[in-house]
Amino acid sequence: MRRPSIYGLSPVALAVLALATLPPDALAQSRPYQPESVSASEYARAEQFLPWHAEKLTSGVTVSPRWVDANRFWYRNQVFGGHEFIMIDAAARTRRPAFDHDRLAAALSEASDESHEATDLPFDEFEFNASGGIRFWTDIDERWDCDIGAYRCTGPDSVARATHEIDSPDGSLAVFSRDENLWVRDTGTDEERQLSTDGEPHWGYGVAPEGCCQEISNRRTEFKPPPVAEWSPDGRRIATHRYDERDVEDLHLLEAATGRPILHSYRYALPGDSIVPTWQLHLFDAETGARVRADYDPVVGYFGGADTTWHAAQWSPASDRVWFSHHSRDFKSQTLVEVDATTGASRRVIVESGDTWVELNQLRTPYNWRVLDNGTEFIWFSEREGWGHLYLHDLATGEMKNRITQGSWLVVQLLAVDEVARQVYFTGVGRESGRDPYRHHLYRASLDGGGVTLLSPEDAHHAVSASPDGRYFVDTYSTRSTAPVTVVRDGSGRPVMTVEEGDISPLLEAGWEPPVRFSAKARDGVTDVYGYLWLPPNMEEGAVYPVIDYVYPGPQIGPIRTPGFTSGPRGQGHALAQLGFITFAIDAMGTPYRSKAFHESYYGNMRDNGIPDHIAALKALALRYPIDIERVGIFGHSGGGFSSTDAILTFPDFFKVAVSGAGNHDQRGYHFPWGEKYHGLLERNPDGTDSFDSQANQNIASNLKGKLLLHYGSLDDNVHPNMTLLVADALIEANKTFDMLVFPNRNHGYAREPYLIRRTWDYFIEHLMGAEPPVDYRIVQP
């Protein structure tokens, strides 16, 4: 087994680091790495490091716990050659297979008359049924029930997977939304009961909003998301919203089809619209259907994507009160509201306002507030002092009682509260001196203030989740160069058992190299910014290499996502390095996990995109690494499509090639909360201009000097194709040569399609490296 050398750097990386000792003129005299062609075999070598191949060379690197009760959870474990299901009992300190995989494969093979292997069972998740057996749906949506005592399987049947339901606390009922109304189903008898009757189109109960980000995708696949709802602890009541999109204007998409195309329309509000979605809290009695409407005016809607989890609501232990939070349209205030579940009487508990956006988590959700079970206090996340921290407040008055945490570091996620011991558990970044400031750690602090205790001492990135009762913490820790280790910790931080020790030896033996971690100064010459470089193997002495910048500007997340181990990071860093590129990714100013000032650095100026920090860092790195600063390319998807096009148009003498996908090139055409939160409310001027003109890529299309490939999916119901077409039209008007690729009938999620990956490689090989790519190389995704 080949292991990374000291400091997490490979031998190749250490050799390159030696170049840092060379004087700047030595690098300046280097020759460009520019082969005449890149062969199909080199593409094949790069292909083996794409995520779907690289992950098969690892084992035990990911643990996503599915809790069965307060002590037990199961997870799907990827192993070499397949996968397995493992059951953990944290209280008993035991780890065992969730069932006998060989016997289950045999029973399923006999019942289905198809061959099944123990390490390749045809499901990724399961649930325990009332008799202690398991129920699962196969990848072709067949439902099976298997007795894991006698190992007999029955099925398949045509009962659809209930993705659209949320079970009550005891599992006896399930709530769902149908035809704009709220329903419950008795899970024992399947009897259904309608709770509301006055729902109407675009004004329904519990419905997933049509606006951003996949309404048309859901319709076409017949996927039904769960309702936006929260059961009371006693299972008697359901809190939900009535979501109003009645007068919101439509967007339209055309599905390519033989003969006439198919028109798809959906409600989608844009910045500056006079009417945007709103919602109002409603409470239903699950037995009688009696409804209580909160005595509180409708608030601005902001639910997006497939995740309809209601992060903004919490019930009291006695099920007599419910709290919810909401923001103003401009996001400059957050409000916590208390509602009496019997009468609907409502009151504002706290209103926090600011000059820019106010958040309850730098990553948007889940929200970092919690009302304590004692009914007299609540925890509130705030960046009021420049960093995101937790504060204890009086529930009756809303007044702050004390700081729970403080200092020049960030609370990331509130995980659990032990009210008896008066302790709160959370993850944070940037607190440990001498460590990578982006590595998450687990902490404990007193609700009454006075100190913070580190519970995860290993100098690594810790991905942590809590058990339902907060007694145990599942902690997977790793670095970019070391395999993950997963442990269960108790409230003292002590590891009570080891769950997994990841194995990445086959990946290393295949030639995989960890990226090089770097820090550099941002545009201001003062602020530290951090990123990674992926270096080509077997670099030639005296050569400088073209560099590709993988960009996602945030503000809600950056391009790197995690400083922990990942075999296939976003941006194809390892694969592109195999082709002879140095690949670069950086969390520039405007991305999260730092101070509020860092995060909001380009508020009101979304064209910034952090690109000046990319340029400053690349210029500095070119003095230390064999980077050809005259050959810089950039690519990205979604916000990265916007920012990569912005980069080549705003800095045309620095960025020579850009590949830009599904870009929100003008926030006036994107979901209203996005631009209004990060750029400000749209203001129209008497001369016909507005406050969003400055961020629109089509307005600077005439600046293009380099090579630009635009691409989009024609059924993108997240980032509408209209924005890319506006850029294309402006480029044509400016008589600029560019390339464009359309993915018919794809939604926003086509970035990992093999054809796009190959075309991206070809484009950079031809126009940035100056070489000839192999003709029509085919990348195969298993």
Say what each PLM segment does.
Residues 26-28, 745:
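Intrinsic low-complexity/disordered segments
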Residues 16, 20, 28-484, 488-489, ...:
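Beta-propeller folds
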Residues 1-13:
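Bacterial N-terminal signal peptides that target proteins for export
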Residues 249-250, 310-314, 319, 325-327, ...:
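Serine-hydrolase catalytic core recognition
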Residues 9-11, 196, 750:
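Compositionally biased, intrinsically disordered low-complexity segments enriched
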